């Protein structure tokens, strides 16, 4: 029996041990490759594990090199060119508060605010009034539910606050979403035309401050969920097809900050802290 064990058992055991060691070596090799960047901090090995896209610093075409007068630039010497660039540099930040309208009647043509929607707007207006922020201006969508929301908010803010209306920020499909929505699918022509309008609104409203602006601004834009979500993606240089993955409550606040050099950050997305649980809706 012992001789049989020696004859057959030992080779089998050796194979098992050898296989285990081989598997262990393979695992170690895999782990070494997976965590190689912890041992080697060269840019190549690090970036292989963390591929990153480039930030477009001139995303709004308001970098000084885009604003400078080309005819003056061609005639200027090095000192003159430096001066021209300095004159085109932004020095202030823009704080943009993207406000979604209150709850509205889905089954009515004009889609007026519901009683709850009006309460939401009142609570939002009080919060903005008590925020100690001196708002610079307000732009509102021309759609009924947004205009009604804006007018309720304005009752709580200084009467001399500059305000304007824009049809560019009306609701619409900004970009074909990924993944597709199960039940909502506008026709291709609607995407084609409405996406162009909403992109036009983004280019007009979302950009760094002009060189002439010397103080930080605090601007209110009262509009719609699709528009706001698209603006977020575009401003942060996220894929625009991801806009539908976010959900914004009625009368929520999304606070966008654009710095002088074009850097963008989000202070809050869909903030509804001014609403009690029984006042929250997402229609």
UniProtKB/Swiss-Prot annotation:
Keywords from the named record: Hydrolase, Membrane, Mitochondrion, Mitochondrion outer membrane, Transmembrane, Transmembrane helix
Membrane-traversing stretches: 7-23
Gene Ontology terms for molecular function: phosphoprotein phosphatase activity; protein serine/threonine phosphatase activity
Keyword rRNA-binding: no
Topology of this chain in the membrane: Single-pass membrane protein
Catalytic activity, as annotated: O-phospho-L-seryl-[protein] + H2O = L-seryl-[protein] + phosphate; O-phospho-L-threonyl-[protein] + H2O = L-threonyl-[protein] + phosphate
Pfam families registered for this protein in UniProt: His_Phos_1 (PF00300)
Chief location of this protein within or outside the cell: mitochondrion
Matching Gene3D superfamilies: Phosphoglycerate mutase-like
BP-aspect Gene Ontology terms: positive regulation of mitochondrial fission; protein dephosphorylation
Coiled-coil intervals, chain numbering: none
InterPro entries membership: His_Pase_superF_clade-1 (IPR013078), His_PPase_superfam (IPR029033), Mito_Ser/Thr_phosphatase (IPR051021)
General function of this protein: Displays phosphatase activity for serine/threonine residues. Has apparently no phosphoglycerate mutase activity.
Homology family: Belongs to the phosphoglycerate mutase family. BPG-dependent PGAM subfamily.
Entries under PANTHER family matching the protein: PHOSPHOGLYCERATE MUTASE-RELATED (PTHR20935), SERINE_THREONINE-PROTEIN PHOSPHATASE PGAM5, MITOCHONDRIAL (PTHR20935:SF0)
Quaternary assembly: Interacts with skn-1.
Identification of the protein by name: Serine/threonine-protein phosphatase Pgam5, mitochondrial
Source organism per UniProt: Caenorhabditis briggsae
Gene (name only): pgam-5
